[in-house]
């Protein structure tokens, strides 16, 4: 993937820059891909279900409302994402099992970590408009993320 600064320099008028600092937890430090959106807080059932389906190298973006008291992604869900060909997972919230996540061949970015798991009541929505980090995202847009930050584009960017 081309570095984020290079994409910004070429496409500054066509992108949204994410203003939320995210940490990397998977083994891939930079990823890009078409977005698929999920909105769920305190319940990761929808995210787990989506990641159990074929991902076609997409990136699941989870708006967990920024909650820090429960983890949206752990090792088992992340392993399912790898098995089902997801390029990455972005979480406006927390993850857990970080020692296992760092060895998985996938990009995983989140606000932080917490050991507690979520409720399992099938609450949440998929394939909807979400907004965090000063950007608006819908399924079908593209996300680019590396150690420099992250950005959203309406379409795949080429350099």
Task: Report the location of each language-model feature.
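Feature captures the catalytic cores and cofactor-binding loops of soluble hydro-lyases/lyases
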Residues: 1-139, 156-159
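Short, charged beta-turn/beta-strand-edge "cap" motif at the junction between a beta-strand
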Residues: 136, 149-151
